[in-house]
Amino acid sequence: YLKVNSFIAFLLVSLCAGVLLGLPLPDLAKSIQKGLGDTLGSLVTIIVLGAMLGKLVASSGAAQQIASTLIRLFGEKNISWGLMFTGFIIGIPLFYNVGFVLMIPLIFALVQKFKLNPLMAGVPMMASLSVAHGYLPPHPSPAALVAQFHANMGTTLTYGIIVSIPAIILAGPIFAKTLSHITPKPLKTFAVQEVQADELPSISSSFLTALLPVFLLVFTTALDVQLGKDSPFSPVLHLISDPAMVMLVAICFATWTLGLRLGKSMEHVMGIYTEAVKDVGMILLIIAGAG
């Protein structure tokens, strides 16, 4: 009986809290509605566009291309470090649950290919995905904090990356070594489904598209600081450095590089975006309820 939907639970708690705090009953419903609107107002565009970008990066094979490239660069001996950086880079545009589902087949494929301990492969990547989801906008929690404290998204992202690096090193490869004595046996029912090599986007397109929001936020923030508030370009910079505008530019760019350019129809790409919105619907409601 106590397993209540999260959104409904937040509404009920808000209602009870309002009554116990002595808010006028006629104003209680309006107060709850205002909290919903104020919280979602600055976040819905960022979260929805971020989910769309992540879904396209995953379904187009760009995430697979990024992972394969980094693993080739790091080599078999340092594969844990390669997976750590893979998880971090992929985790910037992808939500944790999407990245987890996407990367699990890759981890099992590498475990089979290189005879690895599954924990040595999985822990570094999952730690990176988790840290990116918790520390870096445009993910829901950090984006909500940016909105609440009226912080600069680019500055928050920069500091988040700086703090994330030691966190993923400690929680990833270093922690994984302490688990080396544990050797789990993955179920054989996990089927590895990969995009064919000839259907993958190019390495440059994959990296550029996945990291474009990061590049734009850091570049516009640095340029704004360099030029100063009195610059005639300041109003334009403020517009294009707005997180919602950055994500809109990124999604338009991704529609071409990972969609139309690869021969996919506009209808197919828009279908991917529709599925992405379904994936984050409950997240948006929970965030709204918390407001």
Label the model's feature ranges.
Residues 1, 18-22, 92, 168-177:
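Membrane-embedded alpha-helical segments of multi-pass transporters/permeases
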Residues 1-8, 112-120:
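Membrane-helix interface "capping/anchor" motifs
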Residues 3-23, 44-49, 206-218, 238-260, ...:
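Hydrophobic mid-bilayer segments of alpha-helices in multi-pass membrane transport proteins
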Residues 18, 97, 101-117, 142-156:
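Membrane-interfacial helix-loop connectors
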Residues 24-113, 263-291:
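Membrane-embedded alpha-helical segments and adjacent helix-loop junctions characteristic
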Residues 25-35, 66, 142-155, 224-238, ...:
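Membrane-interface helix termini and inter-helical loops of multi-pass transporters
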Residues 76-92, 115-134, 152-165:
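Alpha-helical transmembrane segments of multi-pass membrane proteins
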Residues 158-271:
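Long, contiguous bundles of hydrophobic transmembrane helices that form the permeation core
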